[in-house]
Amino acid sequence: MRVPFIIPDGGGFVKLDAGWIFRYHGPDDEVMTMQYLCAPMEGVTGDLFRQAQRQTFPAADSYYTLFLSPTANRTFSPRELREIEPAHNAGIRVVPQLMGHCAEDFLWMAGQLADMGYDEVNFNLGCPSNTVTVKKKGAGLLTEPDLLRRFFDAVFAACPL
């Protein structure tokens, strides 16, 4: 059995080389429980991986999708639909990861995901890819604090999740 290499990141998370994240909980770190969260890795951790992993090993507590990008046309791409289709994720907890800068589009997608049965979304503010940041998405939104504040004000006021 291969043991993954653990790299502490200093923020309460520990990343493993296979995309896993451990998150610690507990008052004053006295009694800690561990959650196994599967981080998204493009081309690796899609719906087929999640089902194969669940059938072969104990399932992770949550699996995060590759980012979904809400757009003004208010549709899901075929890839996005495949990732979030409840039938493709039976028996596991999946957390859709959203990336964007328009609160109205985010709220539309969050509403659609709530209607599909999801109870949580993850908002990506960390992607450093230039093709993402030039669109004011991912880490690119961090360079626009006023836009980010307006985004969060609107989302926190109306998000169904």
Predicted regions and their residues:
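Short terminal hydrophobic/aromatic SLiMs and anchors at protein ends
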Residues: 5-7, 25, 29
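Extreme N-terminal starter segment of soluble prokaryotic enzymes
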Residues: 33-36
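Glycine-rich, positively charged N-terminal anion/phosphate-binding segment
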Residues: 43-112
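A structural motif
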Residues: 58-60, 118, 160
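Alpha-helix-loop-beta-strand connector modules within alpha/beta enzyme cores
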Residues: 85-91, 142-161
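Glycine-rich tight-turn/loop motif centered on a GG-T
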Residues: 130-147
